[in-house]
Amino acid sequence: MKSTVPEKLAPELAVSKWFNTKQPLTLEELRGKIVILHAFQMLCPGCVSHGTPQAEKLHQMFSGDDLRVIGLHTVFEHHAAMTPVSLEAFIHEYRLTFPIGVDEAGKDGDIPVTMERYGMRGTPSFVVIDRDGVICHH
């Protein structure tokens, strides 16, 4: 697959809370695997109808293989409605089984840390990270 971005090492994830994993995940620990990072918001219609179901399907199709799907709940609007408690209910309701992290709030409260590090412009966003930890599609 031809890269759609200049070769760049993927920035580490800044996560305040994890769901569907017993321990926090780091990209460093996932080196050697292909990582699909799915950034979403619970109240994003495109995330609910397309992005998140696609991420779950990838996770189910390739679990145990050399591909890991990681969800990143990145809240840049409607902050009061998108709490970790609400996210936990969302994960249960939609039967999501892939690991999901809550992106750390940004300094000014608008753009979350990981979203800013990756230059994401909205949700849903998918980032593909190769086995060497390099972003190969954004």
Regions found by a protein language model. Give the residues of each.
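Proline-centered helix-kink/hinge sites
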Residues: 11, 45-46, 53, 99, ...
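Hydrophobic/aromatic beta-strand patches that form the interior of the parallel beta-sheet core
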Residues: 37, 70-72, 101, 127
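Thiol/disulfide oxidoreductase modules built on the thioredoxin-like
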Residues: 94-96, 102-138
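Loop/turn elements at helix/coil->beta-strand transitions in domains of secreted/extracellular proteins
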Residues: 32-35, 65-68, 95-99, 131
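Structural microenvironment flanking redox-active thiols in thiol-disulfide oxidoreductases
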Residues: 49-94, 105-112
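N-terminal "domain-start" segment that seeds a small globular fold
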Residues: 1-28
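Short active-site neighborhood of thiol/selenol oxidoreductases, capturing the structured segment around
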Residues: 25-51, 55, 69
